[in-house]
Amino acid sequence: MIKKYALCLLIATAIAGCKKEVTIKTQPKPPVVAPDSVSFTSVKLEAKKNPGIITKDLVCDITDDQITAVIPQMEKLSKKLVVTFTTQNSTVTKNDTLQVSGKTAVDLRKPVTYTLTSAKGTTRNYRFTVKVFTGIPVLYLTTNGPVVSKDDYVTGKVDVDPNNSFEQEKLSIPLKIKGRGNSTWSEFPKKPYRLKFNDKAAMLGMPAAKNWVLLANYDDKTLMRTRIAFEFARRIGSDFAPQSRFVEVVMNGKFLGNYLLTSQVEVHENRVNITEMTENDNSGDALTGGYLLELDQRKDEKFWFVTKKNLPFTLKSPEETTPAQLKYIKKYIQDTEDALFADNANDPVNGYAKYIDVNSFMNWFFVEEVVKNQDARDFSSIFYYKERKGKLHMGPVWDFDLSSGNVDYSPAKDPKSWYIRDATWMVRLFKDVAFRSKVKKRWNEIRSTAVEAIFKDIDDNAAYLKLSQQQNFSKWPILDKYVWPNAVVLGNYDLEVAYAKDFLMQRIAWIDAEIATY
């Protein structure tokens, strides 16, 4: 047996020895060449390099090709700043002048461009922007007396610091100012204001006009409910939806807090752009428009009337309405209401569609219903307009401080029920199968785009207002206090924002389910 195994081993060895030795050659890997990239790795403003301007080191934000710093002083920059930085593989120049970290002083009152260049010639540009205080624009109001009335204007001026955020041609604007609002003026210490410029002026990228509004948002602790609704309205094409900008307001040297600067609701080429009537427009086509009306239970305008369904309409424009004009628009509104409640209301030719622009009514409805706006169910700030030879439209939307769950005394506090749909005219429209079908189609068109964008808007605005809300609630320490008619008191700004966002998430999901049944 041993001989047998030995023989097998001998044979195997012989066979192995007969094989040709094979050498496998591998190709050498090419050397890894590092990309010739250049970048800032850090940028900061050191207190010791900038005495009298900043009191502690500020680390600048670097996002893509943008560098941003916010200096917590309210005054505009008046001195150059020394910038301290580190880079990857590069030298830094500004307008072909070498910049030395921690030594070169730079005028940063306006954004500057830094150019980084590598040894091999690769370049990259960064835009460096320095803002002051909270980073948002500041309005410095100077008045020739205290502003204590909604009726009497006080003369003065506004100096505008766009804070390197918007283009602003006129930086100092003569004006008149007075109070505005109803409960927001009478009940709250942070007051809203109406501004009337001596001459038309553009504001922070918004088209030129004379009349502007500063909304205080005192009872809206997110500070953004109105802004969110305005932007939603603009995205879905709601008629003449207002533009707006967050601003800090300083009046006569006193900081008043965060405000929303927006347009006055008025007939104007950059606002409600319809024909402006005169006292001579009393017959023919000229008598048919344009009219701007508000459904307002307060009935505190010079010209107003009440329909058979007890809806009070006030006439906003023309301001000096002639008897013929008042008679015409009163009849048109009543004819509209009669058509809505007639037996043939759903007739596409002779029913309500003869009098109203259905798409305009739908877009207005979606804005108000999604955020469940307390006052928009037959109470106030419900605007209509009628252009010359045109139908009745709804808009612009307005007044959203009591929306998105910010009310404790009505069904508007519940995210899971209809509210605007039950208004006098709307409830009748929704009885029409054809109208409900259009509502469903329109909802499906905007649901994944404009509606979904609301949540990103909330997040973006919360980030944008991070420093502003801190200053606002330092001035007005109410986060842990009940302010009429808050549904919740959460004691924290982030929780207030989360509450509003959650309300809208629940609400939109509920609307999804309801409209799916149409």
Identify the meaning behind each predicted range.
Residues M1-Y5, K19-K20:
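Positively charged n-region of N-terminal signal peptides that target proteins for export
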Residues A14-G17:
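C-terminal motif of bacterial Sec signal peptides marking the signal peptidase cleavage site
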Residues K19-I136, L141:
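Beta-rich interaction/scaffold domains
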Residues S90-K94, I236-E248:
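Short, well-structured beta-strand/strand-turn elements
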Residues V130-Q168:
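N-terminal module-boundary/linker segments of secreted carbohydrate-active enzymes
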Residues G156-A216:
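Conserved oxyanion/phosphate-binding beta-strand-loop segments in alpha/beta enzyme cores
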Residues I173, T184, F188, K316-D378, ...:
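Middle-to-C-terminal accessory/interaction subdomains
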Residues K196-A202, A216-N217, S238-P242, K254-F366:
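Internal "kinase-insert"/substrate-recognition segments embedded within catalytic cores
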